[in-house]
Amino acid sequence: MKRDKKEQIVQDVAEKIDRSQGIYLTEFQGLSVAKMAELRNEFRKAGVEYRVVKNTLIKKALRDLSSADRLASGLKSTTAVAFGYDDPLAPAKIIRKFSKTNEALKFKMASIDGVVYDADSLPALSEMLSKTENIGRAAGLINGVVSSVPMVVNAVARNLVSVLDQIAKQKQ
């Protein structure tokens, strides 16, 4: 590969890293072409880009990242990078699900918002709720509280009327 082409790839990968909320390194050695296409399709559906890049080019693209040294330690063997643009946890869910049926796919490590996670972190990352899911749950909780306030106020007023009615009956 010519130097110009390599520089273009490094620049392209560096730009993708800057845009990504989550960067995942995987090993895919032994994965068939059909399985790799299936995996890429799953990533595409989730808005995740999956790209095979030479380790030396990834190291150069990671230069400006604060977690570059820790991520560079995972650059051994064949490496493909998953870029999570909108949901930083989407790649973890796909990698975990796919690797259950395809042992050739191995999770190496990830960087989410500058925090590096090793291979043992995949189960925890894949089970975390996304930002959207957390916002939805919080909105549901708030809605539940807001809708129960009028019922509580009505119950207090109803009980007060009942007590006053009983007091009035006792005085008669």
UniProtKB/Swiss-Prot annotation:
GO terms for biological process: translation. GO terms for cellular component: large ribosomal subunit. One of its GO terms (molecular function) is large ribosomal subunit rRNA binding. Keywords: Ribonucleoprotein, Ribosomal protein, RNA-binding, rRNA-binding. Pfam families: Ribosomal_L10 (PF00466). Coiled coil: none annotated. It comes from the Bacteria. HAMAP family: Ribosomal_uL10 (MF_00362). Part of the ribosomal stalk of the 50S ribosomal subunit. The N-terminus interacts with L11 and the large rRNA to form the base of the stalk. The C-terminus forms an elongated spine to which L12 dimers bind in a sequential fashion forming a multimeric L10(L12)X complex. Belongs to the universal ribosomal protein uL10 family. Forms part of the ribosomal stalk, playing a central role in the interaction of the ribosome with GTP-bound translation factors. This is Large ribosomal subunit protein uL10. It comes from Chlorobium phaeobacteroides (strain DSM 266 / SMG 266 / 2430). The gene is rplJ.
